[in-house]
A protein has these predicted regions:
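A short acidic, helix-capping loop that chelates divalent metal ions and anchors anionic groups
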Residues: 46-47, 146-151, 220, 266-268
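Hydrophobic faces of well-ordered beta-strands that scaffold small-molecule active sites
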Residues: 22-24, 75-77, 109-111, 137-139, ...
Length: 302
């Protein structure tokens, strides 16, 4: 697969929920960029398509000034890049304050973050970032299993993620986590489910969102699939994993839950999973019992 190397100043990715947000590039690429399952900024041989860079503050300010001139007021603002929280705290604070100063009635300010970026910042720094106007942070938990995280080169572990998640919430910033169904493959599916539910219970994030693993020939995990070292779960198993994660959550978990991605096999949402747990599970069980899912096979691109 041919992909063109792009400048860090070119915005490529944002969460689906930020589809109608104003995108402001703060960083380019990803400071880690080693996860096997991810092809956002690299290819299957780890060739980099977009270098990691903290963009100059003057460049960021110009984007904000341009947006103000064009009348982009009253929008959510998404600070784009693989992990803008890797930027120095004062750099990030200046950007957030400038957004709030130049754009009227900003609905929210949000960004991606890595858990390690959060752990490198003090509680005081995170509180200052919150006070400057950052409302929500998106973080890829992917799995609570240390085995799965290690195999996938995630560069962190469950305990570190729990600490990072709690730091974000303690600072008053909303935390939205991503859970990647199927990431353990067939071999580690049960461990992936149990440990992910455990970590979600420990953190009790504001929101968590399910995603379904997709593997194509342009990501490193493709090699494991070809060699037989990784086996994709069947379509119905994505629903089973989701059901079992929900079923194993502790009674303290009051998170909002979303399936807001086109790659998912169903769309269910809850504004409080503690309140909606029984109905959520009932709906998933109805899908799991559907004969169409039981006979469906995952198509793998060649």
């Amino acid at each position: 697969m041919i992909r063109v190397k792009v400048s860090p100043k070119q915005i490529l990715f944002r969460p689906p929920v930020e589809a109608y947000s104003l995108l402001i590039a703060v960083t380019g690429g990803c400071s880690w960029n080693k996860c096997k399952f991810c092809g956002m900024y690299k290819g299957r041989d780890y060739e980099v398509y977009q270098e990691y860079e903290i963009l100059p503050i003057e460049y960021v300010f110009k984007q904000i000034d341009r947006a103000a001139t064009l009348g982009y007021h009253g929008f959510p603002v998404y600070l784009a890049g693989g992990n803008p929280t890797s930027a120095p705290t004062e750099h990030l604070i200046k950007i957030i304050k400038y957004v709030r100063e130049k754009l009227d009635n900003v609905k929210r300010v949000s960004c991606y973050s890595k858990s390690l970026d959060i752990l490198r910042k003090s509680d005081e720094e995170l509180k200052k970032i919150k006070d400057a106007g950052l409302d929500i942070v998106y973080m890829g938990l992917e799995s609570g299993s240390n085995t799965v995280l290690r195999i996938m080169h995630k560069g962190t572990n469950a305990n570190s993620f729990i600490k990072a998640g709690k730091k974000v919430i303690q600072a008053g910033i909303k935390l939205s986590l991503y859970v990647l169904l199927g990431l353990g493959g067939k071999k580690y599916s049960k461990e992936h489910v149990i440990e992910t539910a455990r970590v979600l219970t420990e953190i009790n994030p504001t929101i968590f969102r399910f995603r379904s693993l997709g593997v194509g020939p342009d990501i490193p995990l493709w090699y494991d699939l070809e060699k037989g070292d990784f086996e994709l779960i069947d379509p119905v198993d994505y629903l089973i994993e989701e059901r079992d994660i929900i079923a194993n959550l502790g009674d303290n978990v009051t998170s909002q839950v979303f399936n807001d991605h086109a790659a998912n096999y169903c769309y269910i949402e809850s504004d409080n999973i503690k309140k909606d747990k029984d109905s959520f599970l009932k709906t998933l069980n109805s899908y799991i019992g559907d004969p169409r899912f039981l006979t469906m096979k995952r198509k793998i691109p060649r």
